[in-house]
Amino acid sequence: MTVHRKEGCTNMKNIPVYRFPAGHARENGELELYRASNKANTACKEAIEKAISEHYCDNVLHREAVAQVAEQFGHERILYVLAITIRQKDWDGRFSADNKQWAKTVPVSENLDAWGTDRNCYLAVNSHSGLVDLFTKLAREDARAHERKPSVLGRLKNRPPEAAAEAVKKTKEPSL
């Protein structure tokens, strides 16, 4: 899998989120997928930290922070990294109960190294927990909004065959 870089900007939206531990990847010949996903997860974590830093002003975290990261990584990866972050910091009272509950619903495999340390700890966002909580709330809202808005192409693909045939028939009939 090739990751394309364009003048410092990296688009990793098309790299699938690999949700299994390194051992599973090794056993199934999927190490390349695991490594590409892990690289994208790390870059996403860093992009979230940067976006929070750039878009937190006057005690407000602006929605552009999420849009900036989503453009590069997509919502699935952002939410995966945020779920890992909240799970790793479950003891932290600055995360809302709602976000903690949500994080428990996201499938994340424990990924132990040779010393018994969960490799997921390296993917935890290192910004202020209160700001990460706000970012998570905004990211979840943004992901829901994008779920509800299918693209025009998506609507055409999901259109029943009868409706598509009727639309074609109407365009071919001459107007009277």
For the regions a language model picked out, list residue spans one by one.
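Gram-negative host-targeted secretion-system effectors, predominantly Type III and Type IV
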Residues: M1-S175
